[in-house]
């Protein structure tokens, strides 16, 4: 990732939101990038993530994969803001968000879809989306317009009056993504998007992610379903023992002997 690598080298030393005015001088260099550099995390003296750097560009899907206990979930949660960073920086469009809580990152355009069902169970499908629109859009006319557009875009208009709790796994994911887009994010962080989804709905989730990238949204995915994820992403980072083992396209990942030996297995095929 040559361009992102050059950006990473320029981000060193920037630590806090008050530096924003200086960042605006070269904001164009960082626009459309989410870049983490040197992420490190330790628990009780044991380092679980060691100087991990990664990047996501607008309009691409990037996987963050690795075996259980490798540190990928901790790394992912540092990017979302769920886990504080011990060392390293996270920048969104050139703004340092390393010490910001999740809700402030959301204001800068980062959406997050957790593994667990996050629908408002007591609301209808349309009111799940409307609840977010009422926060971000003052005009009722615009709220109604955006609501109809999202229901149509994700093919759930026929379910608008249905209780959200009655949806299937695939329908629920479509609603959750539609609701996340109501806040107009530039990046989406997807935690185990294939978890709890019937096999028949896997292709539906893959199409939803492709739809996000076509919208120009950068997507970072972590998932244990490696075959489904590699069949979807533009690039992937493989984490092993808290460090980046390999970065590249799905073909590069599958062909790498160390990745096959330590993670995928010798018989793995896409």
Predicted regions and their residues:
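ABC ATPase NBD coupling module
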Residues: 96-116, 140-144, 214, 253-258
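Conserved catalytic motifs of ABC-family nucleotide-binding domains
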Residues: 184
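The feature captures the beta-strand-to-loop junction immediately N-terminal to the Walker
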Residues: 65-67
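Conserved ABC ATPase "signature" region
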Residues: 95, 130, 141-159, 206-210
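Catalytic Walker B motif of ABC-type/P-loop ATPase nucleotide-binding domains
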Residues: 188-192
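Conserved ABC ATPase signature
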Residues: 163-167, 171
